[in-house]
A protein has these predicted regions:
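Positively charged interface segments
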Residues: 41-115
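Short, small-residue-biased leader/transition segments that mark boundaries at the very start
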Residues: 2-6
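Positively charged, polyanion-binding regions of nucleic-acid-associated proteins
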Residues: 7-52
Length: 115
């Protein structure tokens, strides 16, 4: 079903190694990198494993959607995918469960964990 397609897409996104300057890249650059297109004449090399993620990142970067279009139902669906994939849990680093993300600001945060 559609759920499986999204699940596979999200899994690939989460396992993709990122360039060292990922946090300094804007959304356009991130999408270019993830889409495999070259920008600035050279392709950035992915070397860093993603250790945290927020739903907005998955929505905008993995699915290529606009942030203002994220509905609560979409959030639940994406959170459901993270649960199904396993290996990700809500952060306990902050009381609110939110941390700051470049581009997106404070967002509910999921961190990688080894079972």
């Amino acid at each position: 079903g559609l759920g499986d397609v999204y699940k596979r897409q999200v899994e690939e996104y989460l396992e993709r190694l990122l360039p060292a300057d990922w946090s300094g890249m804007d959304l356009y650059q991130r999408r270019s990198f993830l889409g495999g297109s070259e920008f600035g004449g050279a392709t950035a090399t992915g070397i860093v494993r993603r250790e945290k993620v927020c739903i907005m990142e998955i929505w905008c970067e993995c699915f290529g959607k606009e942030r203002q279009n994220l509905k609560r139902t979409d959030s639940y669906e994406i959170e459901g995918i993270l649960k199904k994939l396993g290996g990700w849990q809500k952060t306990t680093e902050t009381k609110t469960g939110k941390t700051h993300f470049p581009i997106y600001g404070p967002q509910k945060t999921f961190v990688r964990h080894e079972d």
